[in-house]
Swiss-Prot record:
It comes from Mycoplasmopsis pulmonis (strain UAB CTIP) (Mycoplasma pulmonis). The keyword Ribonucleoprotein applies. This is Large ribosomal subunit protein bL17. One of its GO terms (cellular component) is cytosolic large ribosomal subunit. GO terms for molecular function: structural constituent of ribosome. Belongs to the bacterial ribosomal protein bL17 family. It holds the Pfam family Ribosomal_L17. Part of the 50S ribosomal subunit. Contacts protein L32. The keyword Cell inner membrane does not apply. It comes from the Bacteria. GO terms for biological process: translation. The gene is rplQ. Keywords: Ribonucleoprotein, Ribosomal protein.
């Protein structure tokens, strides 16, 4: 049986771009509401980004920049800079598990399972 958490029936470019956008939004805003399938896939991406942020080397900055959108936070700083300067020190003593998924009732229009994914 197929893995139900994977984003199927889409090409790899679409999948990569959706996960890039969602991961940048969760880093900037702290939490987002999305479908349960996207939240489960997004958890993997965000955990890897924060782990790269904890390393804080030039190579890890470049790898993180390649998988994030170039947007600003509410206070005007770049999302990548916010990841490395604010979020990474916050999770310095934590070994993984940086996100939490909270299940919501299904969406009204198409009965899709919804969830909130947030940083712990």
């Amino acid at each position: 049986m197929a893995n139900p958490t994977q984003l199927y029936r889409r090409n790899s470019t679409w999948r990569k771009n959706v996960l890039r956008s969602l991961s940048t939004e969760i880093i900037v805003n702290g939490k987002i509401t999305t479908t349960l399938t996207r939240a489960k896939e997004l958890r993997k991406v965000v955990d890897k980004l924060i782990t790269k942020g904890k390393k804080n080397t030039l190579a890890s900055r470049r790898l993180a920049a390649a998988s994030m959108r170039k947007i600003k936070t509410k206070d005007g700083t770049d999302a990548l800079k916010y990841l490395f300067d604010t979020l990474a020190p916050k999770y310095k003593n934590r070994n993984g598990g940086y996100t939490r998924i909270i299940k919501l009732p299904p969406r009204q229009g198409d009965n899709t399972k919804m969830a909130i994914i947030e940083l712990v």
